[in-house]
Amino acid sequence: MSWRLLTGYQLCRLRLFRKPQPALKIRPSSVCVTYGTDCQSNKENKRTVETLRACSVDIGKICRLKGWVLLEEETYAEEIANILKELGANQTVIASILERCPEAIVCSPAAVNTKRKLWQMVCKTKTELIQLIEQFPESFFAVKDQENQKLNVQFFQELGLKNVVITRFLTTASSIFHNPVENNKQMIGVLLESYLNLGGSEANAKVWLLKLLSQNPFIVLSSPTAVGEVLKFLQGQGFTDSEVLQLLSKLKGFLFQLQPGSIQNSISFTKTTFECTDHDLRQLVVKCPALLYYPAPVLEERIQALLKEGISVAQIRASPMVLELTPQIIQYRIRKLNSLGYGIKDGHLASLNGTKKEFEANFSKMQAKQGRPLFNPVASLKVEE
């Protein structure tokens, strides 16, 4: 495709397609996962339906969401409800959990009790535990590889991660606990070695690692080979060890999830667009790692959106962080600034930057400043007699 942005630069745009996965039959002994099917009342397990109704569960919701569980011959609805009750859940909470995660009733009580003990390794109280289960029932009722999950929890605790962080991982990044613990240990070792090889201080290594993990736990799913390839590529592009370490920290480890080919396309596009030298390019990338992270077509779309607002390439180059924002966010923020009479075309783009919270706070300050009187009308005037 031909770039529409001031140049004739050409890049190849790749598209990935996924074939839909066929539905699978899940037995009670399997990991609890999501499959949808219509209820067939003549084939429903009557005991299961009656037990769920006794728990005030809306059967219609289960039919619409995961009706297949009602067709299973062997279910544990009563046992699972009792486990939740033992943890302090009332009937309303139990019904809510089972309605949102019906597959819980095909998990064996033994497996669920094992999972309860696992989560209690990082939860201080039963109250905290049941609140987590209510928020993330699907994570709790994924009862596969529990011994490996336990080993990973112990490993992260030994590493120095706080229980509150591990709890967040269990609920929002559960896949890292299914990864073999030896693989996670190996990747942690690779990260520490890379940090030290890039000039990081040994005294600060553990603090750096724990911060990186808390920001991006999925980094442990990267491969040592991918890490080596990305580091070698960036060093081949002229980035110093210090600059690579800055990129690794600023991108929160997502750097290792990129492919050298994609990075090369983004670098080439940036260099051509901003007409900069190799040295200037590296400075831009270190200042705004988004130039490295986002694919060239995404960068082009965002630059084009800025140009349509009357912003120049020179302005973008002076404040490249603006490219971290989507065109929709840019348009919204420009309209808000225009409402105050602020001409973004003539000013610095820094006023557009920041998170939503940061932008709104800065906007409020600008708004208050604009409405402030030039003098205090109640202050006494100093008049020379």
From Swiss-Prot:
GO terms for biological process: regulation of DNA-templated transcription; termination of mitochondrial transcription. Monomer. Binds mitochondrial DNA and plays a role in the regulation of transcription of mitochondrial mRNA and rRNA species. It comes from the Eukaryota. Belongs to the mTERF family. The gene is Mterf2. Transmembrane segments: none annotated. Keywords: Mitochondrion, Mitochondrion nucleoid, Transcription, Transcription regulation, Transit peptide. Pfam families: mTERF. It is found in: Mitochondrion matrix, Mitochondrion nucleoid. This is Transcription termination factor 2, mitochondrial. GO terms for molecular function: DNA binding; double-stranded DNA binding; nucleic acid binding. Residues 1-35 form a transit peptide.
